[in-house]
Swiss-Prot record:
Source organism of the structure: Candida albicans (strain SC5314 / ATCC MYA-2876)
GO BP field: amino acid export across plasma membrane; ascospore wall assembly; intracellular polyamine homeostasis; lipid homeostasis; membrane raft assembly; transmembrane transport
Superkingdom in the source lineage: Eukaryota
This protein's name: MFS antiporter QDR3
Region feature Disordered, mapped onto this chain: 38-109, 338-367
Keyword terms: Cell membrane, Glycoprotein, Membrane, Transmembrane, Transmembrane helix, Transport, Virulence
Consequences of knocking out this gene: Leads to defects in biofilm architecture and attenuated virulence.
Length: 697
């Protein structure tokens, strides 16, 4: 029996057969082979199973397709390209999952001298690598030391002037309240400017941002040391704080460039020694140099620290931002498939409107139109799964360590394995796919309509870049619409502001009768609370993780509220005790050691609370933890700046006893927020769609 003739060679070649599904584009494979890929955990493996099964379904169906007449002649070229690209992405996933979790699993490739990136890159003694994770461990930890030392400067500048406030008042012929403005405005700069430095580093690279910012830091420190009046001092302190804030934002990104997630914990701990040592050393060294050479010596000391950092960065810090990114290759594949989206929809419609009787299997039997739809539907499913692969790869590879840029880092336990986080992340992936498809479709139409108007395109590009660099970093404020975020940040900010009430009161009260301590001794008064900061950061971090793990063992999942337990109760009890001890003993001029008991207790309590709230914030914003921490830093630095502005007038007006009794009451009342979150956190997560806020970032 003779069979009906097949489609023309052109059409037959366009049909997706079994061989095509196993092939990937040569160029993509080469990119994958030269890129470093690391395992993404069990989520990625779950995602990998479905595309493979779908491929088999597609192959079985498409092997049967033959037709009797060329009445349906759709252009299947885009479908074939999409099939190849998706197969390439699946092959990439297999390599991703099969890699051993080490950051040196691929042979290193040094960048030629002339192709190095960043300012003055040719004079760096350490060569740039295609992928910074290929550096030997000795080089990696040298870079960690450099950025840790550089990160000391910003927090150091917040407290270095505190022992010398009276000297500044006398030298610049001003008053204590005005000098406190220079301290508060510096804090404000530390909170605001990191939003932009981080954006700049992604656009221009880490090295260039470090070099520009520390060049400015050196210059503004010299200017501050030479300030002729209080107005110049305040203006220069704003610029000084803003330039020093770069490493607070970019340092975490550098750690992420150098280490895969499995290796970042130890590096993160070493890196954070710098920001933590700053507030501890600043009052001691500041008091010593101001006692010997006056308050201007504190700014020369800052200049020396920043200049040393600049030298280390210039000669020993190569660009670490990755040059070849496998994830970007995968994104390009998905963008390519989206560009063909309208053509694929046309093919789908053509199949839907075709005469089903004209389509036969290999035995000449008609194939229902639903099977043709299944072919196209399977491709759509594979595309969706491939997008999920890209999402998980990007999250695992690019998400840097989450840190609190002023206070000690508390161990962060990723909650992607909890049922809640899986549900949240899946919703986020779906929303992002829908948004990306819409944006790409609009972009394609816009490009087609304006391809003859280059001037408009250039102007539009400039406006887009300016918006992304200047305005978009402020979008993180939108997260304050999410109740858990605004509640936890409000309490964290109040607790942080209270720290500066203590710090400013120490320098004010101990410099007066009957104590009359010198600048050197004033600096030593900050040791008790600094020591308890270290203690609480160690104890609180382990306590935090123990609470989380105990809840997970009992209930089978990780929830953010499990971090808010007896650690918070201890802090709530210590807060009013510390405030009352310090406030009333310093008011009645008790023996100088007694008020320091209050500062030590407060330091321990505040670190327990701040550590727990920061980790709760990160866990409540899966995939956006860094954005949440930056927002938290912004709000609390604003409140800390306000505290430095008003503390001295309040001490003179109502006295330390009444002031710190009020602070104790505010802390006690605001701590009810944490108890409320403990009870209602799950309700907020279930009834408020944080994904809508993510889409606006």
């Amino acid at each position: 029996m003779s069979h009906s003739p097949n489609l023309s060679p052109q059409i037959s070649n366009d049909i997706i057969d079994a061989d095509t599904t196993s092939l990937a584009s040569t160029e993509t494979q080469q990119n994958i082979q030269h890129s470093q890929i690391h395992p993404i955990g069990h989520h990625g493996r779950e995602q990998s199973e479905e595309p493979q099964n779908t491929t088999k379904t597609t192959t079985t169906t498409t092997n049967k397709i033959h037709t009797t007449t060329p009445s349906v002649d759709p252009d299947l070229g885009p479908l074939r390209e999409l099939e190849q690209d998706l197969s390439s992405l699946e092959s990439q996933q297999e390599q991703y999952l099969s890699q051993k979790p080490t950051s040196t699993s691929i042979k290193t490739n040094k960048v030629p001298l002339r192709e190095r990136r960043g300012l003055l890159a040719q004079i760096v003694l350490i060569p740039e690598y295609e992928d910074a994770r290929d550096y030997p461990n000795k080089i990696k930890y040298l870079i960690v030391f450099i950025i840790a030392f550089a990160s000391l400067a910003g927090p150091f500048g917040t407290s270095v002037m505190l022992p010398a406030i009276d000297d500044i008042v006398n030298d610049l012929n001003t008053n204590v309240s005005t000098v406190n403005v220079s301290v508060g405005i510096y804090l404000l700069s530390l909170g605001i400017f990191p939003l932009w430095w981080s954006s700049f580093s992604e656009r221009f690279g880490r090295r260039s941002v470090y070099m520009v910012s520390f060049t400015l830091f050196v210059a503004f420190s010299i200017g501050t040391a030479l300030s002729p009046n209080i107005a110049a001092l305040i203006v220069l302190r704003v610029l000084q704080g803003g330039s020093s804030a770069s490493v607070q934002a970019v340092g975490a990104g550098t750690i992420a460039d150098l280490f895969i997630p499995q290796e970042r914990g130890q590096a993160m701990g070493l890196y954070y020694l710098g920001p933590l040592a700053g507030p501890f050393l600043a009052p001691i060294l500041g008091g010593a140099v101001s006692q010997a050479w006056g308050w201007r010596a504190t700014q020369w000391l800052l200049m020396i620290i920043s200049a040393c950092s600049f030298v280390l960065i210039t000669f020993f810090l190569p660009e670490t931002l990755r040059r070849v990114d496998t994830i970007q290759v995968a994104k390009d594949l998905m963008k390519k498939s989206d560009n063909n989206g309208s053509q694929n929809e046309k093919i789908h419609d053509d199949f839907a409107g075709a005469d089903n009787s004209s389509v036969h299997d290999i035995d000449g039997n008609p194939i229902p139109g639903t099977e043709l739809h299944q072919v196209v539907s399977n491709l759509s499913r594979r595309s969706s799964n491939a997008r999920s692969i890209v999402t998980y790869m990007e999250e695992q590879e690019n998400e840097g360590p989450i840190i609190d840029p002023v206070m000690p880092s508390i161990s962060r336990l990723t909650t992607n394995r909890s049922a809640y986080s899986q549900r949240i992340h899946q919703n986020y992936v779906t929303d992002e796919l829908r948004k990306t498809t819409s944006n790409l479709t609009q972009s394609n139409h816009s490009q087609y309509n304006n391809n003859n108007n280059n001037d408009n395109d250039k102007w539009s590009s400039v406006k887009t870049n300016c918006y992304d660099l200047i305005i978009r970093p402020l979008h993180s404020i939108i997260l304050l619409k999410h109740p858990p975020v605004v509640l936890v940040i409000s309490f964290s900010a109040i607790s942080f502001a209270a720290i500066y009430f203590f710090n400013m009161a120490i320098s004010y009260e101990y410099a007066r009768s009957p104590y009359n301590f010198s600048s050197v001794i004033l600096g030593l008064m900050y040791i008790p609370n600094s020591v308890t900061y270290f203690m609480a950061s160690i104890i609180g971090g382990k306590w935090n993780d123990r609470l989380l793990n105990r809840y997970a063992q009992k209930h089978g999942e990780l929830v953010p509220e499990s971090r808010l337990s007896w650690n918070i109760v201890v802090a709530i009890i210590l807060y009013p005790m510390a405030c009352l001890i310090f406030g009333w003993t310093i008011k009645y001029r008790e023996f100088w050691v007694i008020p320091l008991i209050g500062t030590a207790l407060f330091g321990f309590a505040s670190m327990l609370v701040i550590g727990a709230t920061v980790t709760y914030l990160v866990d409540s914003l899966p995939g956006k933890g860094a954005t949440g921490v930056a927002l938290n830093n912004l709000i609390r630095q604003i409140l800390a700046a306000i505290a430095t502005f008003i503390v001295e007038p309040l001490l003179r007006a109502i006295g330390a006893g009444v002031l710190f009794s009020i602070i104790a009451g505010i802390l006690l009342v605001s701590s009810l927020v944490l108890l409320y979150l403990k009870k209602r956190g799950a309700f907020f997560r279930e009834h408020y769609d944080v994904m809508d806020l993510y889409a606006k970032l």
